[in-house]
Amino acid sequence: MSTVIYASPIFGPIHSRRLGVSLGVNLMPADGKICTFDCLYCECGFNADFRPKLKRPTKEEVKVALAKVLQQRHGNHEPLDVITFAGNGEPTAHPDFKAIIEDTIDLRNHFFPEAKVSVLSNATMVYKPEVREALMMVDNNIQKIDTVDMEYIRRVDRPQQPSYDVKDVINN
């Protein structure tokens, strides 16, 4: 399986079968992966193989980069169906996730009010109130839970926190 490390903070657009023309927002460093899981099937590879040297993009860097791309696409009359938070790891792990979502919604409303905002997440951070609040703001809150079998999760998803329990995620 080939490994994909996405540009940061903005990549694409790509054409998604599920979402349409999707502009990606990667809240992780452009040179590596930071994730709360280390899934055997991850397209970004294993955490240990792609430890970043760069820092995560700041809230302001994300806002400026997203505004630039949205303004350019709007000016060129290029379509956009969705702004999707995904990339090199778990987007909700960014310390400014909620504020970045708020900025994104403001920019979307200005340039592409018909576009959706989506988040692809492994659901490991939903226990945080500010993450839950941010996820409630987006149009497509796409949370991934592979199974409720903790043995399978430990073997395949490989949570980075030993205390991880899928039941806690479900109850939140």
Q: Residue ranges of each PLM-predicted region?
A:
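Conserved AdoMet/S-adenosylmethionine-binding subsite of the radical SAM
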Residues: 92-172
